[in-house]
């Protein structure tokens, strides 16, 4: 009986091989994987276009809050980037909305950088805030214990009661560290100072390629919008990041890709 089964198995294997069945099965498996990649790619594109890049409510809140603080004499657009102290009132007034945006859109980071100068005229350190949530899929902590502060003024850190990352700095250090401006900051800002009268902030949204925040191990790609006041003056950028580690969690292991080839909308 065993000999008969062995013979039948040998014949079956031979027929599959000579009939091209193995090749067909392999192709079918490849087609299934390819379709899963296409489906997941469509999912990611939908997230990028309709969720992660939906920052209009956040930018409106920042602009409205900034305008109110200016009218109260607590903030001056022309001096927002002078120091951490000049930017702190606005940061504290909008940080809850920044965190809310991170939560609702399930992103791994959110940031604001203030600036009032042409970035082509030299490197300067800039005030702002950068928050991280390395696991947006987990249940959010009511006290924000799952968040980390990457950049924020000391007074903001004290007020938020959120832990700082080991790479925390009170400012975005460009001149001090002698590093060029991050692309997610430089490109949308410079584009906006030349076009703020012709295009809205949303029109100038910018998907940036992968980068690492100085002294951070987390590689991420970004989406940024310029901050533009009622007079058309550009006073900073706001945006989100998606770490590549998190993106890999959204993809089954067979679909992990090289993000240097990721096509951004």
Name each region found by the language model:
Residues 63, 92-105, 215, 254-258:
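Short regulatory alpha-helical segment in sensory/regulatory domains of signaling proteins that mediates
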Residues 260-265:
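Conserved small/polar residues in nucleotide/adenosyl-binding loops
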């Amino acid at each position: 009986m065993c000999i008969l089964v062995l013979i039948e198995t040998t014949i079956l294997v031979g027929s599959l091989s000579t009939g091209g069945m193995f090749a067909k099965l392999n192709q079918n498996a490849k087609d299934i994987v390819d379709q899963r990649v296409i489906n997941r790619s469509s999912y990611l594109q939908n997230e990028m276009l309709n969720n992660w890049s939906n920052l209009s409510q956040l930018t409106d809140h920042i602009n409205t809050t900034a305008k109110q603080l200016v009218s109260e004499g607590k903030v001056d657009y022309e001096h927002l980037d002078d120091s951490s102290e000049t930017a702190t009132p606005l940061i504290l007034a909008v940080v809850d909305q920044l965190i809310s945006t991170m939560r609702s859109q399930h992103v791994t980071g959110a940031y604001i950088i203030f600036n009032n100068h042409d970035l082509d005229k030299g490197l300067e350190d800039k005030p702002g805030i950068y928050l991280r949530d390395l696991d947006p899929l987990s249940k959010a902590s009511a006290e924000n214990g799952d968040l980390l502060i990457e950049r924020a003024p000391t007074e903001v850190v004290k007020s938020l009661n959120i832990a700082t990352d080991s790479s925390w700095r009170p400012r975005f250090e460009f001149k001090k560290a002698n590093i060029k401006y991050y692309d997610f900051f430089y490109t949308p800002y410079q584009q906006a100072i030349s076009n703020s009268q012709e295009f809205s902030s949303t029109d100038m949204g910018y998907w940036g390629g992968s980068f690492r925040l100085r002294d951070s191990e987390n590689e991420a790609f970004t989406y940024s919008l310029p901050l533009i006041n009622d007079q058309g003056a550009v006073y900073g950028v706001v945006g989100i990041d998606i770490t590549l580690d998190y993106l890999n969690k959204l993809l089954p292991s067979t679909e992990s890709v090289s993000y240097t080839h990721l096509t951004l909308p």
